[in-house]
Structures are given as C-alpha cells and as structure tokens.
Amino acid sequence: MRTTNYLLSTQKEAPSDAVIVSHQLMLRAGMIRKLASGLYTWLPTGLRVLRKVETIVREEMERAGGVEVLMPIVQPADLWLETGRWDQYGGELLRIKDRHTRDFVLGPTHEEVITELVRKEVNSYKQLPLNLFQIQTKFRDETRPRFGVMRAREFTMKDAYSFHMDQACLEKTYQKMFDAYCRIFDRLGLEYRPVIADTGSIGGSASHEFHVLAQSGEDAIVFSTESDYAANIEKAEALAPSTVLAAPTAEMGLLDTPNAKTIAELVSKHGIAIEKTVKTLFVKASDQIETELIALIIRGDHELNEIKAENLASVAAPLEFASESEIRALVNAGPGSLGPVSLPVPFIVDRSVAVMSDFSAGANIDNKHYCNINWGRDVELAQVEDLRNVVEGDPSPCGSGTLSMARGIEVGHIFQLGDTYTKAMNAGVLNQQGKNQILTMGCYGIGISRIVAAAIEQNNDKNGIIWNNTLAPFSVVIVPMNMHKSHRVAELAEKYYAELQAAGIEVLFDDRKERPGIMFADAELMGIPHTLVIGDRSLDNGVIEYKDRLSGVKQEVAIDEVINFIKAQLA
C-alpha cells in the first residue's frame, strides 16, 4: 500500500478526553475516529488490525467445531419478553419502535435470537451437539462510555452458542471452547489469565473470564502464587478460616463512642484494633424471608463483596442498601452504631467474623458500642457465608500459596448456561425415547474490538504502538529518503515494494513528499514491526538500514539480501 493512496490520518497529539494509552494511540495512529459518545469509525489502519483479530478468532472457532452464522442486530421485543430480559436488562438495552409501533431492541447479545433459530431448525437429538457462532456488531447503551473502544456503546464481538442434550455434553464443548480461547490469545501474543467468574445478567452456572493483564484494566483479578487458581474479584475466595474459636478473655462491656460513625473513627479515637471490629450493613431482603431488611456482618477492615451478597437466597437482587430511615424504623440506632447483639432482624455473618472472639461492634444504640463480644456467650451465631472481597496475601482456597492481585481487561467470557434460555423459550428436541427434552446451552463471547485496545495497552512505548508480526496493520514499512530527488532510491524502493508484495508480505510504501523525521515518527507511532530505510549514503556502501520496532536495534543489510532477511524476520 502506498501512503499517497492511503488514509494515514496520524496526529501529533491526542484529544484531552483520551485518558488511557490505547485510546490516545488509536486516535494518534489513525486507527479510529469518534463520531459520537461511544461510537467510533474504524479507519483503514485500525480496520486492518481488527480483521486480523477476527481471522484468528474465526480459525480457532472452526477448529473447535464452531459453525458460523450471522444474525440481525435488530431483534423483536417479543423474544426478550419471552425470556423476561425485556424488564431485567435495564438501561443498557436500547429499545426502538418501527413505523408500525412494534417494539424492537438493538442487540447487546443474541441468546434469544439463537435459541429462536435452534427451536425452529433443530428437532432431533441426532442434530446435536451444535455450536453456532457469529462475528457481529453489538450495541449496549452504556451510562458512561469511556476509554475509546475499550468501553464503547457499539462494538464488534464474536459470540457463540452451543446446544446439548445433557450437562456432560455441554462440559465437553465448554472445555473445547476454553482451550480454543487459550489458543486465540496465545496466537495473538497477549499476556492473559483465565479466571473463575460470576455469570452476571447472562445467567447460568459455571463461567470463566479471560483477562489481558494491564495496569489500566478496570477489573481486579486474583490468582494463587503457587497454583493455577485464578478468579475475578467478584468470585474470588480465600481459604476458609479455622472454625476453632479462641476462649473469651473478658466480659462484654458497653462503651460510649460519641462521633464514632465509622470504623476508622472507632479505631483512632478508642484504640481498638481494626481486626477486632465488625461492621453491620443493612440491605433489602428477598421475598424468601418475612422481614424487609437483613443485616450482613463483615470484619471492620474488609469490604463487602456485593455480588456474593446478592447471590444469597435471602438477599434481594440487585443488592440495595437500606436507608437510615428504614434502619431506624427497626432499630433504635443509625449506621455506625449497629451490631449483632440483640439485633431484631436476621443477619448473615462472614466466615472471617464467625471465628472472631473479643470483638467490638455497634450496640444498636446511638453513640454506643459493645466490646469483648463473643459468639455463643453474648449472641448466637446464625448463618455463615463468604461475604467479603479477598485481599492480597490471603491463603489460596486451593490450599497452595497465597493470593496475589493484578489489574485486567476482560476480553472474553464463557458460560455454562444450562436451560436458562431454552426452558424460558421451550426450546427442545425429541430424545432417544421420542419425548421432548429441553436443551442445555453454553455461551461464549470475545470482544474483538476490545482485544485491539487491550493489545495496545500491553504493547507500547513513548513513541507509539509496538505491534507483533501477527497483529500489525503492515509487516514492513519502506522509508525512502528523498526519493523524489534520487532516482536510484526511488528505483530500489519500488523494487522492494513489488518483491515484498509478490511474496505476500503486507508492506506500506511511504512515498509522501515529507521530511524523513515525520516518516520515521509515523512508522513508530503506527507500530509497524520492521522498517527499511533507503538512502543515498547507505546505497554508496551497498546496504540499506533495517530497524526493529520492538528492540529499536538498527543494522545494515546488503541490498541483495533484503527480501530474504525480511522473510526470516517474519518466519
């Protein structure tokens, strides 16, 4: 490709609203342009990278037994009403009407559409298992689109859906897809981790996320220092603490704690060790219990894991904290003075709190706290659950090593959905006994456009993007110095351009009438892995200059060896 026939569109500076590196560099390198909030046009350079990601994903999906389809982005509301997600999905679901005032949605995902297809087209167990995938545009009406294509409203995604007669068959396909995802990210050259995950609004049972490691990642991921255990912060667990309780050392006492509204104030003003404190949080209860509120009790230095909490049967989902007026209607105290002793509502205790002794908590009287509380003696221990976020250094739940934490960008997510959608939509086939059987389902997503941004977050320097040979928009850039004044420079540049193209190598020929410094800066900004510099001075010595983008190393290559040399670099 000649730059004079190409939409290069590089920029010296990024807009002020581009915060993270990938957003800045994608704009500066001429990969994307913002059309509106969360909406981007992919320019030629960006599209070339996007297509390379798509190709690898498509190849590995087909290798794993996937069959490609293409479904409409506009979906009838009837399907979403059938599964109940019309009301459940929330503001991210963009609802539209056609000229006949019929309701539709702009698809954020395609579980309903694929299930509708399968229930019409598949009628026998002999047609299963079946794994269908597509690479398609999605739309989610994000509250705050940000970080460029990392969290855009419109994005490109590969989503796959598998259908099975039973759980055992689903688990086999799930493992195939897990392995396929690992191959995809290996081929893309990304540093990543698969982690155990929560199923979220998609539903189902087992789930894994795939995270590209990057400091700018929005997600906290947790992994063992000595085993393969890894999970996102929502799902991560620490090894359950010993259930042996230390014997009480003192009687429970009542403390005056004026102006101690927080754990930090209680610790600083009254000299209580933070690990000997607990905090009591009131949330809305589910309809499975008789009271409107339920209390969650965690250690003072721990954070509530809201996903773990709302997954409990007695807690309303989504999680909703009680207001002070709602709390005072049940307890003669407000937040900051609450605790388990004589609490008039049911409560759930975190595992770490269940093994505490001689601890302090609110007395359910304003400006009062109890000290030296002990389970069994002062208050009966009720339901015990894992309620907290893990912290660095917690023992790994596998019993091997401790937990470490890193930031990650979620680029893939796979689910064992079970019959969440097939049961709601009555999607079944005739089994071997000739009876209708509801299908079991899996779901597997990869953020194609997000992968591009994540790769840049992992591979950049002060000069721009550093693409590997797999993802680079062009493998080689030819920079001819003053070619418009030097016939032999122009002639050799044309020769290399033709020969590299004939060899199937993607090459950018910078034939602009620009200063060499601008041409070099653009090549580095775009992240092209291999640069060939042709100039009169080097030609006098029978060589050209080669520069490797990753290492920055320059070397001279004999004129007649250039093509073979480049082939070797790409091998």
Swiss-Prot record:
CDD domains in the cross-refs: ProRS-INS (cd04334), ProRS_anticodon_short (cd00861), ProRS_core_prok (cd00779)
Pfam families: HGTP_anticodon, tRNA-synt_2b, tRNA_edit
Reaction catalysed by this enzyme: tRNA(Pro) + L-proline + ATP = L-prolyl-tRNA(Pro) + AMP + diphosphate
Gene Ontology MF terms: aminoacyl-tRNA deacylase activity; ATP binding; proline-tRNA ligase activity
Gene3D superfamilies: Anticodon-binding domain, Bira Bifunctional Protein, Domain 2
GO biological process, one term: prolyl-tRNA aminoacylation
Recorded superkingdom: Bacteria
Keywords tagged on the record: Aminoacyl-tRNA synthetase, ATP-binding, Cytoplasm, Ligase, Nucleotide-binding, Protein biosynthesis
Cellular compartment(s): Cytoplasm
EC number from the UniProt entry: 6.1.1.15
Primary location recorded for the protein, binned into one broad class: cytoplasm
Keyword Nucleotide-binding tagged: yes
Free-text comment about domains: Consists of three domains: the N-terminal catalytic domain, the editing domain and the C-terminal anticodon-binding domain.
Role of this protein: Catalyzes the attachment of proline to tRNA(Pro) in a two-step reaction: proline is first activated by ATP to form Pro-AMP and then transferred to the acceptor end of tRNA(Pro). As ProRS can inadvertently accommodate and process non-cognate amino acids such as alanine and cysteine, to avoid such errors it has two additional distinct editing activities against alanine. One activity is designated as 'pretransfer' editing and involves the tRNA(Pro)-independent hydrolysis of activated Ala-AMP.
Protein name in the entry: Proline--tRNA ligase
Gene source species: Psychromonas ingrahamii (strain DSM 17664 / CCUG 51855 / 37)
Gene that encodes the chain: proS
